[in-house]
Amino acid sequence: MLRTIGTKASGITFRGVRFQSTNPTVKKSKPLRKFLFRLGLLTGVFYAGGVAVSLKNDIVQDAFIEHVPLGEALLDFTEYYVNHPEELSFSSTKQKLQNFDKTVLIPKRGVQSAKVEDVEHIKNVTRGSADESVSLSKTIYSNLNLPSIDLEFKDEVLQSSVEHLNHLIDTIRTQVNTVDLLPQVEQLKSSIKELGSKYNSFVTDRNTAVEEALAKLDDELKTKYQNKELALTDKYISDLQETKRQIELKHDQILAKELDTAQRRILLEAENIIVQARINTLSEFESIISDKIDNERNGKLKNLDALAKRVEELENVQIKLFDNISNAEKLTNLKKTVSKINRLLISSNDGVDAKTLINEVNKFKTYSKDLNNELISSVLLNLPNDKALSNGVLSQAQLLARWDLLTPELRSASLLPPNAGILGHLSSKLFSFFLLGKSGTPTSGNDIESVISRVHDNLLKNRLDDALEEVSSLKGWSRKLSEDWIVEARKKLELQVLVGVLENEVSLL
């Protein structure tokens, strides 16, 4: 059983065993270390960002080199390794580290390193007056990683020079003795000399060709400039002459207009002077007459006022008489026009001439303008327009003739069955010849023969309204066939009715 013996501030005792409590230790803050770490980090970020931006932008690069310490050296270092990435390869880095382990004995420079390997014995080459021994050591050459020139030229001299350079680079990679390089160097020198001579001849030929081309181009430009100058001169002369001609023409027009205006102004002023002189003369004459009348009023001209009043009454009577005569003349013309229109509609056998009918209707409209009669104005508005009357109006005989021509088609249409085809039309046309027509007093039936007989009788008796009513009662295909006849008959009937109304109204005026 767990029993607590005692409790202290520094620990707890369980069953006689004291357990010491451990409080967590507080770490001391080191602000200087944090500051240096942050400063180094920010400096590294600043330099890395500055180098990266300077490689992309020349303006930033100039400012970075000029104002940032060690900016130029750091930028050169970065550009070198950017342009020579092979220097950062693993093999190259390893080789450099191996070379760092070797020391080379340099004369007069102190104690030799103990880590130098494969060092040959130092030989005395020269002895000076100071009796100093100069130690030379053979430098340990490592294999150089020089890249070859990977270029191809069509020119044999350039290609040969490139091959010699590549051969020299290969020799430098593998050999250390400079005596073996002499043939390659001589060949390279001869290739370079040949290349230089060829380059000089090329430059000479190019300069000569450029000078010739420039001279030729100069001549062409001079010729073109002269031709252009002549053309522009001719154009400017022609434009100047044309402008001069237009200015002269415009000046002549303005001068003529001003002369005409001045002449009109002078004539108007003269006319005004003459009119003013006449007015002054009349005023003087009126004043003289007025004085004489005033002087003679009490003598010979006592009854002058009564005479003037009588003359005014006579003038009013004369004006009324002239108005009555004018109205009578207008009414006479209206009656003549209406009678002529009615006569054209009734008595013509060859149809009503459209031009004559339109002229008479327009005359009637002209004569009736000053009457102010509402009935006549309303009838004139309901008359067919000139476009509707341009095709003329059929006479009674023409309507009868057209009805007779339409009768066989109506008989044939009356025999058509519903939804008739070609055979139905042919059979109805054939059987229509065997129908017996009705004549004499019309019957009261509704069959097609009774309708044809009644219409024919009404047309003979000049009852166009009854005939039109009978034809309008037709239905179906028969009504469709007679549509044109109904239009012509209705136009004639409307004209007859309206002209009759006009004739009655004019007779009552």
Curated annotation (Swiss-Prot):
Residue intervals on the Mitochondrial matrix side: 20-34
Topology in the lipid bilayer: Single-pass membrane protein
Keywords, comma-separated and alphabetical: Coiled coil, Membrane, Mitochondrion, Mitochondrion inner membrane, Transit peptide, Transmembrane, Transmembrane helix
Protein name per its UniProtKB record: MICOS complex subunit MIC60
Coiled coil: 202-257, 293-330
Annotated family: Belongs to the MICOS complex subunit Mic60 family.
Gene Ontology cellular component annotations, sorted alphabetically: MICOS complex
InterPro entries to which the protein is assigned, alphabetical: MIC60
Transit peptide interval: 1-19
Highest taxon of the lineage: Eukaryota
Assembly: Component of the mitochondrial contact site and cristae organizing system (MICOS) complex.
Location(s) in or outside the cell: Mitochondrion inner membrane
Functional description taken from the UniProt entry: Component of the MICOS complex, a large protein complex of the mitochondrial inner membrane that plays crucial roles in the maintenance of crista junctions, inner membrane architecture, and formation of contact sites to the outer membrane. Plays a role in keeping cristae membranes connected to the inner boundary membrane. Also promotes protein import via the mitochondrial intermembrane space assembly (MIA) pathway.
One Gene Ontology term from the biological process aspect of the record: cristae formation
The keyword Transferase is assigned to this record: no
Mitochondrial intermembrane side: 55-509
Keyword Transmembrane helix recorded: yes
TM spans (from-to): 35-54
Main subcellular localisation: mitochondrion
